[in-house]
């Protein structure tokens, strides 16, 4: 849905998505590349502020968890005989960014990506879909109707079939 909606041209929105915090650098053993968004919504609407609070909490928690994991790993590394010279090669890369998938006077679809890599890697995507006019979060049911699950399943199966026809080695999980 968001991918298709992102292709629609938009002029004169009532809402904006701006970079609230941007940082690139090193803090301790963590290499950071962080861009945190803030939603500036239509006056009198509460949901953009709630979404901003959730985004701030999500990114703060993710950064804190990454720092905690790195500190625990560092402690274990030295407790098991690792040296400072060996440790010098170890860092964690932490990445936080956002992407406006769709924005009009009525709807905002925003994705926030959080990722870290070091011994292992993980990446998470969190999406916020806002009905700006009615000040509520949009669900698939709101957009597609009561039969949204069947519509989604049909679309997914169709996309898998198309990709498999184009590439016999494609795999899906």
Segments (PLM) and residue ranges:
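Compositionally biased intrinsically disordered regions enriched in Thr/Gly
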Residues: 2-173
